[in-house]
């Protein structure tokens, strides 16, 4: 119980929140093979079922508890753990993400994750969470060792997309439990749900979705088809993901000041700075 700032869900600022959760990590043979193939000794992410909690956690779209989002006198210099309420994801995905795509896109482009079993959805979302955090700890600047610089607005947007696109490519390559479903989660949740958050102009995850849409559109991986609806080219998404990750990791090798400047320039190439009187 304490003053917490939620990542999503419409509650702005710090509110007193509380929750009860039960941790569960998938442990069957396919998942053990995944953990062995992508070993993550620094893993501090915990997959869980939200059992009960305050309205901000039970009713909104927020599925994560970050201890660094607690109002406290000092900001942690590293992330100690993160708790994810993945049992909430199915309802969010089926009531927001899929309908959002179906309103504007070709329905046949979203197949593997449509109407999936609740247990499969939970385990697939755990896979996304594991791979996402695995890639946070790869590359020139491991997230846990550079949390101060990587949680700023522009560097953070690029970091989130980098690790999601790396996860997407791994899932598309095969051998990952529920890989096709996870790939759709990543692509459609980022592009369809997050930009529609109520506070989208101030929401970090919304920024990642808008940046991804702009990047994929430039790459020809997503666009308006001859039917007048959006369509995606999954092979082009894979190729764009590889380029994006390479661009980001090249900039991560720069000194801090140059890295921060280059991160802003890269984001502003796709999301221009607002003019007078415009929202961010």
Where are these regions (language model features)?
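Active-site recognition of the HExxH zinc-binding catalytic motif
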Residues: 125-141
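Post-HEXXH active-site segment of zinc metalloproteases
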Residues: 124, 140-161
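Short pre-active-site segment immediately N-terminal to the catalytic Zn-binding motif
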Residues: 111-128
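Long, well-structured alpha-helical subdomains associated
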Residues: 122, 168-279
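An active-site-proximal "capping" alpha-helix that borders the catalytic cofactor pocket
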Residues: 156-172
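Contiguous, non-catalytic segments that form substrate-binding/exosite surfaces or channel walls
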Residues: 1-112
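Conserved helix-loop functional segments at active or binding sites
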Residues: 136, 140-144, 169-176
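Short acidic (Asp/Glu) and glycine-rich catalytic loops that position anionic groups and cofactors
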Residues: 104-111, 142-146, 187-192
């Amino acid at each position: 119980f304490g003053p917490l700032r939620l990542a999503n869900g419409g509650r702005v600022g710090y509110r007193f929140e509380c929750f009860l959760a039960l941790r569960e990590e998938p442990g069957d043979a396919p998942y053990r093979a995944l953990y062995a193939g992508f070993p993550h000794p620094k893993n501090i992410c915990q997959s869980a079922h939200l059992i009960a909690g305050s309205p901000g956690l039970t009713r909104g779209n927020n599925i994560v508890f970050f201890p660094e989002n607690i109002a406290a006198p000092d900001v942690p210099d590293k992330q100690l753990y993160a708790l994810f309420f993945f049992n909430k994801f199915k309802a969010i995905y089926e009531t927001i993400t899929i309908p959002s795509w179906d309103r504007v896109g070709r329905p046949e482009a979203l197949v593997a994750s449509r109407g999936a079993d609740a247990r499969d959805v939970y385990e697939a979302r755990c896979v996304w969470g594991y791979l996402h955090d695995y890639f946070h700890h790869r590359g020139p600047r491991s997230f846990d060792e550079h949390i101060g610089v990587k949680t700023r607005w522009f560097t953070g947007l690029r970091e989130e997309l980098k690790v999601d696109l790396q996860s997407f490519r791994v899932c598309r390559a095969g051998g990952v439990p529920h890989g096709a479903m996870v790939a759709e989660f990543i692509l459609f949740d980022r592009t369809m749900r997050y930009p529609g958050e109520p506070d989208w102009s101030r929401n970090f995850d919304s920024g990642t979705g808008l940046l991804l849409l702009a990047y994929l559109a430039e790459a020809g991986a997503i666009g308006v088809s001859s039917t007048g609806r959006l369509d995606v080219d999954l092979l082009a998404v894979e190729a764009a993901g590889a380029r994006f990750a390479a661009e980001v990791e090249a900039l991560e090798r720069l000194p801090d000041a140059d890295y921060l400047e280059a991160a802003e320039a890269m984001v502003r190439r796709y999301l221009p700075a607002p003019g007078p009187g415009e929202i961010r």
